[in-house]
Amino acid sequence: MLEVEAPLEIVQESSRKLLGLTNLSEAIKPIIEAENPNQNSLCLLNHKETLSHIIPGSLGLPNFKKVETLNFQMVKEYPLLTGYPLLKQKDIGINTTGVLLKQLMVNKSSCYQDGISTISVPVHMPVHPMVMPTKVSSGSLVTKLILLFPPMFRQGILLFKKLSLLGFRLVRFCLKAIMLKAQEGLLLIAGQVHVLNHVDPIIVH
């Protein structure tokens, strides 16, 4: 079989049609850009590299070779925060900041180990003259008991009359219960008097 060599122009034209290109410059343009990159693309790459080193949380891992080619113009765009001097408190033209700081540092009792300073102010507890501890004397309790005894005796006598009509055994049982309750009441009264007035307890025989 005979092999016929096609001319170069026909081959280039057919390749351009297959690639969808109309000019030869469009096919050669990517190759030229790969060999001679544009200055704008270089600046964009340099800007991305600097951002990958400056912005925290960037996906790019730190590379020491890239640090050497950092663009130092970024430092001008993002300057470091400068420390501002402390504002001075002035009172009639006199600077009192230094004096206050010295007083706080000298007073060790008002400074903690972590550097937090406090001002100790004496606390005055409010005194209410109307609120006073209630004290009951034993004389007032005795007078109350004396006033209560007559009606109690009257009720006891009436109850005794009613019980006597029912039977002697029931009367004796009721009197015993009344005596036990009376002794219990006297012991309770003696305990209250001892707590309030700190006196010796009443001995009940």
Curated annotation (Swiss-Prot):
InterPro entries from the UniProt entry: Corona_nucI, N2-like_embe-CoV
Organism domain of life: Viruses
Transmembrane intervals: none
Keyword annotations from UniProtKB, A to Z: Virion
GO cellular component term of the entry, any: virion component
Subcellular location: Virion
UniProt miscellaneous comment: The gene encoding this protein is included within the N gene (alternative ORF). Isolate N2 belongs to genotype B.
UniProt function note: Structural protein that is not essential for the viral replication either in tissue culture or in its natural host.
Family of the protein in this entry: Belongs to the coronavirus I protein family.
Protein name: Protein I
Taxonomic source organism: Human coronavirus HKU1 (isolate N5) (HCoV-HKU1)
Lineage, highest ranks first: Viruses, Riboviria, Orthornavirae, Pisuviricota, Pisoniviricetes
Gene name as annotated: N
